[in-house]
């Protein structure tokens, strides 16, 4: 299910750090606080499959007119983004929250819900067109000189689709308790408007982690 959200700033603009993804995640967890046990489970434990943990929701990048200066991004008027999840309880909590409230906090900004579209799509056939709303991130861990290093894959890497399917299989297993019946494959030559996207995310040790993903249409 998807939630397409549009917000108006209470005081003219929305100011955020350029790497704002952890703030969006915090925004989502706050939406779930009517059920604190579920919110705590999602934040602290998540859905697991084969030693991997999945939160089972994704936030798209913020859209709107903006300016960037000194590591900050200022949205000048409305700001919009999407939240998507396959989990019924998650979607039910968000639907209820958005039907009951229209004033929220995003970082240090008070924002007012001015537009909401809720929907779900069923795809038939074996081909779909995808336009990325958030970066696609695939990574693998490599041992270099006795140290573990993280390598973020590009769509042109030979093992890109292999890791994409492995991630899809585990996530499906974690969500639904069974293996998917098919596989997915992206033709790197069909990836239009391909754009590398790098952001920072607070790590558990207190140091920021650089994360690399890819945007585009395919």
Predicted regions and their residues:
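RNA-interacting cores
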Residues: 1-218
């Amino acid at each position: 299910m998807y939630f397409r959200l549009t917000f108006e700033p209470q005081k003219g603009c929305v100011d955020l750090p350029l790497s704002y993804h952890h703030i969006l995640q915090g925004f989502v967890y706050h939406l779930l606080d009517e059920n604190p046990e579920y919110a705590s489970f999602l934040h602290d434990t998540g859905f697991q499959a084969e030693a991997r943990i999945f939160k089972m929701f994704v936030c798209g990048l913020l859209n709107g007119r903006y300016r960037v200066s000194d590591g900050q991004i200022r949205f000048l008027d409305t700001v919009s983004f999407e939240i998507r999840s396959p989990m019924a309880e998650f979607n039910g909590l968000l639907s209820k929250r958005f039907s009951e409230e229209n004033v929220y906090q995003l970082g240090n900004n008070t924002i007012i819900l001015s537009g909401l579209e809720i929907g779900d799509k069923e795809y038939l056939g074996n081909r779909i067109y995808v336009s990325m709303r958030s970066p696609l991130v695939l990574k693998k861990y490599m041992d270099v000189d006795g140290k573990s290093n993280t390598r973020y894959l590009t769509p042109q890497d030979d093992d890109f689709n292999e890791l994409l399917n492995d991630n899809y299989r585990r996530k499906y297993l974690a969500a639904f308790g069974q293996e998917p019946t098919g596989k997915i494959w992206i033709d790197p030559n069909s990836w239009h408007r391909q754009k590398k996207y790098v952001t920072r995310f607070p790590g558990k040790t207190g140091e920021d982690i650089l994360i690399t993903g890819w945007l585009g249409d395919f």
